[in-house]
């Protein structure tokens, strides 16, 4: 079995698909969008919808690249409830570059909830947090996410995390969104978060930043420009999330508000 978080590496529109799986690819400007829908259990990926967007290397993009941000925001918005508060969770270890995408993305989220911030008509309530790793907090990701959900009471949770690919040419060049929750491909991962555990829609968002080396199961491969992939990828994902949640604001306005 291929070790990958990317649904379209397992199920493509050009191959024979197992029963209960549909895949389709379309072009939107310079972005290739692939949608995979899994309608039954028992396959390599959980049942649900997956969307991947093939883009130029995110290391050369930023939060103002509308050609990528607009289609990404549209695809993400389609997976979310139409209204209500949203909590964005930055999963990962900010001290390990390949795993820092989630925490770095949270820094780019337009937060509209908080003490002293009255509701604004037309602006969706959004909170964002990077809970850290259990070795630092003493609490599991499931415990922290559960406590945050009970306190904030969002209508949906967006989990941002670094992803694993099985194809080196896709590292730093693909965005993926899914409504299946966070279900890492790596065996023994403690990052599983889904609707069954938390009682609300859980959307996963990420960019592949590593792959497992074939020569050894304990070795990983990362792109040469990893620092730029994380920095620019976090800005790009943050902009797409902001645009998906605040469609009344332009990309330029959101960039100015985030700073």
Predicted regions and their residues:
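N-terminal amphipathic/basic leader segments beginning at the initiator methionine
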Residues: 1-48
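An N-terminal, well-structured beta->alpha segment
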Residues: 40-80
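Short glycine-rich or small-residue beta-strand-to-loop segments that form or flank ligand, phosphate
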Residues: 54-56, 85-96, 128-132
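A glycine- and small-aliphatic-rich helix-loop capping segment at beta-alpha/alpha-beta transitions
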Residues: 71, 75, 97-114, 174-183
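Gly/Ser/Thr-rich loops at beta-strand to alpha-helix junctions
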Residues: 91-101, 135, 162-166
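Anionic-ligand anchoring segments at beta-strand to alpha-helix junctions in alpha/beta enzyme folds, i.e.
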Residues: 101-135
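A structural-propensity feature for long, helix-poor, extended segments
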Residues: 122-149, 153-157
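A structural signal for small-residue-enriched, beta-sheet-centric alpha/beta enzyme cores
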Residues: 129-130, 143, 159-259
């Amino acid at each position: 079995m291929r070790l990958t978080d990317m649904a379209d590496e397992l199920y493509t529109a050009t191959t024979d698909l197992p029963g209960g799986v549909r895949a389709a690819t379309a072009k939107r400007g310079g972005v290739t969008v692939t949608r995979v829908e899994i309608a039954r259990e028992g396959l390599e990926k959980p049942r649900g919808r997956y969307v991947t967007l093939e883009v130029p290397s995110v290391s050369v993009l930023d939060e103002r690249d509308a050609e990528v941000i607009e289609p990404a925001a549209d695809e993400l918005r389609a997976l979310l409830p139409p209204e209500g508060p949203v909590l964005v969770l930055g999963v990962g270890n900010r001290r390990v570059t390949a795993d820092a995408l989630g925490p770095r993305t949270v820094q780019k989220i337009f937060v509209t909830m908080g003490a002293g911030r009255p509701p604004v008509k037309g602006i969706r309530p959004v909170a964002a947090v990077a809970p850290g790793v259990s070795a630092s907090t003493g609490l599991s990701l499931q415990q922290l996410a559960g406590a945050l959900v009970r306190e904030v009471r969002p209508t949906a949770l967006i989990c941002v995390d670094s992803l694993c690919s099985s194809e080196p040419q896709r590292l730093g060049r693909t965005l993926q969104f899914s409504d299946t929750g966070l279900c890492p491909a790596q065996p023994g991962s403690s990052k599983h978060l889904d609707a069954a555990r938390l009682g609300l829609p859980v959307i996963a968002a990420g960019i592949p930043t590593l792959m497992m080396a074939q020569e050894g199961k304990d070795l990983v491969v990362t792109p040469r420009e990893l620092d730029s992939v994380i920095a620019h990828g976090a800005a790009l994902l943050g902009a797409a999330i902001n645009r998906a949640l605040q469609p009344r604001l332009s990309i330029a306005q959101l960039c100015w508000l985030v700073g």
